[in-house]
């Protein structure tokens, strides 16, 4: 049942493909401090992490039909171990139609990456997250000997499991931003042409042109616009309607610099983007990549 069918909204439905609900007690103190700094909704963030039911109410209030719940293994920068995969799978099992679980395989901390991808797929994981600047490797490092990364991409391609790659800067302590340049994902598009790749954040704020080029070049490469202030989207991507079939809406809430969800949605809807293109970005593209 959709929000529209429940009579809650006459507006087109929304999929926020990039939201962080995570086990906050596993985050490194310095990372948690950055996440919480200056926020007024920290108690709500903790409440939603403890209860998927409460988070679903939050989605209802924001008129979001489905959400990508992003988690990834990052023992060095964020603090998460492989246990985060089981956590997010269990969390999203409360409503797997509405909650799309994203987990990850860290190629530097796994022996059999392909087997782990298969396990995660069976567990209910709908997409894999690669965060180069937090996992401390380049997305194309398989070309210089990181074999488990190649195995991960190969199995994800085989199982039709989309891979979201973080692109753009990070201000978290210990992050290595050199790894997050979008152009490093060009090899992934070439070597795994049938793998769906989503460039998270569209390379913001330094490498938007690279992301735009890659999305146009590779038939299975997409990008989300999470973490970009909506009022800046047209400034950074003035030709966004040319790639409207391959852009996904996301907020990156409650990441640094993202105060809320509803405000982001309202500001995006106010942009001078054709209604048909908005519909694709807000819902259709993600619905196609992640069918119910």
Please identify what each model-predicted range represents.
Residues 65-66, 74-171:
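Active-site gating/metal-coordination segments in enzymes
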Residues 126-127, 141-248:
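Catalytic pocket-lining loop regions of alpha/beta-barrel enzymes
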């Amino acid at each position: 049942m959709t929000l529209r069918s429940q009579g809650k909204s006459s507006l087109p439905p929304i999929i926020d493909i990039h939201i962080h609900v995570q086990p906050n007690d596993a985050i490194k103190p310095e990372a948690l401090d950055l996440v919480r700094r200056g926020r007024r909704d920290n108690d709500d963030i903790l409440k939603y992490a403890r209860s998927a039911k409460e988070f679903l109410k939050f989605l209802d209030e924001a008129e979001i039909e489905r959400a990508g719940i992003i988690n990834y293994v990052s023992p060095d920068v964020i603090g998460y171990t492989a246990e985060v995969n089981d956590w997010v799978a269990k969390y999203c099992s409360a409503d797997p139609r509405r909650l799309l679980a994203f987990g990850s395989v860290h190629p530097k901390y796994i022996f059999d990456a392909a087997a782990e991808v298969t396990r995660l797929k069976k567990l209910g994981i709908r997409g894999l997250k690669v965060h180069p600047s937090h996992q401390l490797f380049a997305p194309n490092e398989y070309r210089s000997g990181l074999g488990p990364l190649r195995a991960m991409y190969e199995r994800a391609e085989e199982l039709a499991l989309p891979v979201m790659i973080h692109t753009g800067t990070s201000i978290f302590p210990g992050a290595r931003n050199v790894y997050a340049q979008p152009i490093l994902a060009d090899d992934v598009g070439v070597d795994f042409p049938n793998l769906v790749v989503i460039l998270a954040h569209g390379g913001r704020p330094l490498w938007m042109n690279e992301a735009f080029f890659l999305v146009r070049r590779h038939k299975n490469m997409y990008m989300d616009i999470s973490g970009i202030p909506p009022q800046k989207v047209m400034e950074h991507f003035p030709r966004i309607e040319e790639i409207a079939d391959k852009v996904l809406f996301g907020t990156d809430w409650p990441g640094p610099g993202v105060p809320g969800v509803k405000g982001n949605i309202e500001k995006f809807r106010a942009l001078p983007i054709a209604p048909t293109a908005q519909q694709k970005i807000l819902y259709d593209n993600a619905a196609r990549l992640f069918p119910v």
